[in-house]
């Protein structure tokens, strides 16, 4: 049986994992790069134990863009120092197989094992084939647990034993593993690579149909230097090193006297793409710069987020000089930066420790600055700083925004949630925990502007008296509220509206073509709470709808679809490969689009070759620019190569202006454009690209324009959520995608959302989309 659970932070998870191994069990501890460093003491300390135990496997997601973290630091140098083997999966299949292999290595060589998964794989999905289920018996509990102690003399002994036993064995393993892939092709030019960049290199090779020997490493610590030298000596021409991160492999080769072409000194490349690799190999890539700048889209908190009112209040206090410095943290609260309600951001749990240092250095600023942190991060590592403020008697104000869940990463539970991952009710009480640490605590409702203002005023007054106080602002994450509680409940009274645009702090409201604010399909109605925009409007221009006019997600009703009967078909009648990219704004349903296409590829028989899709994750999903890619058939990479896409889909019209996007389209293929406009609050309507700008950008391309949002609303969905399904229907009519029978498309849509009510709406949307071309 596999036991899965969330720990409060990565250091605790690593300790829990180590405890599992002492009980004889194999364990996988997952984290991103920041989590590695947060757990660094346990990671490094545990790396040198060399007695038999269960396998300790660290599954660590890198992010060399970065898109979801703040780190572009290459951790392989740390792994090398810790003498732990490192597996870098090249495909999704290898990523799935890696834990089993790691467990075998961990048990045999009595070592922790790192699976370093690249951001390119973690932010994509690919075809995998399931293996036979294997069961490993628990190892015997070590007779002498005293061996697992790190007294200085024992640490020395452990290090020496690792050098004598573990490392020679691991070096033999990496040099002789069949998982090193050497693809010979004439020896004129060679590429050494590892991880997901292997797929990118193959994409370039196949596109240009060039001779290229490839040595693809599966394990990068220890470095299989003998195999690398053998490969290097077999190449008559240049040898290239393509690796994400820093120059780890490149430096290892150069130390051995090999002359390779890799990254230049002070290179800014931390993550390769097929385009960058092609250019590195000497191929010319035609770039088509646009004269029109893309629309700036800073990520926003969700429409109706309980943090909205607090952000508005703090931004105003900052503007008026009542607050001079705001120290922020990691999580949804970081998005308050784009509301001018937060300034610094350093690391998980570090907001109040920054504030404390600032106040200790400038005691006169104790009542002029605040720190902000989320409840999940406070439980993760922020409470250490809370205790430090009490311990060191540092006056000031710490704000904990408590939405009960770890919202930014998907709504996982934390100790402050109602339940844990297993659904068990929790006894932890955040306010009592803070009080138990010796804090004075004030509580305010996140949907009550006046209460927030009053509470913050009181908190700053307490700070003026040289005391420390914690303000807890409480309101449930809007994503966790029941769907029936959501929907547009308000309207703009244009006679009262002065177009001050204070309400545009929420992504559920946008500037209309007439200049007046208007509610859009993202509006959640603050999930039945007192709406933030209503409270923020200084002119009372926002009013509740009459009962008869209320629009809710539950209002739509669709006829029952006919029963699906799949026709006979041959995969040989379909294109050898299909590739497309979808651009839009976070929240428009790109992820659903990709799921449908994946199901379609399975039904159409493309699983005999490969299916991959890539997606933007992280803060960009919160109203920022997002891109999804999909490929099936004879394909390798989740990142597309220029001139390879059979179609480009743009769910928000201006998003086609993003650099490099139009270059992805192959000659003669189609750009499918939604007429939807989402104007971010950081620009005016006049600054948004004109229709002439868009037309000029796509001049010379084959273009199909459709208003899928209007069509979705026309057929009965006032939320516009099925606009992406309308677009899928339109896509199904365009070549080469029209070679796949309509019934297969419909079955794919149904497979993703089979609930009768949802399927009925999606069926209507799909068929409506087909009628638009």
What are these regions (language model features)?
Residues 2-5, 23-38, 53-60, 365-380, ...:
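A short, small-residue-rich loop immediately preceding and capping a beta-strand
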Residues 16-18, 39-43, 66-73, 97-101, ...:
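Short acidic, glycine/serine/threonine-rich loops at helix termini
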Residues 35-38, 548, 555-773:
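Active-site cofactor/cluster-binding pocket
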Residues 287-394, 436, 554-574:
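Cofactor-binding active-site loop characterized by glycine-rich and histidine/acidic residues
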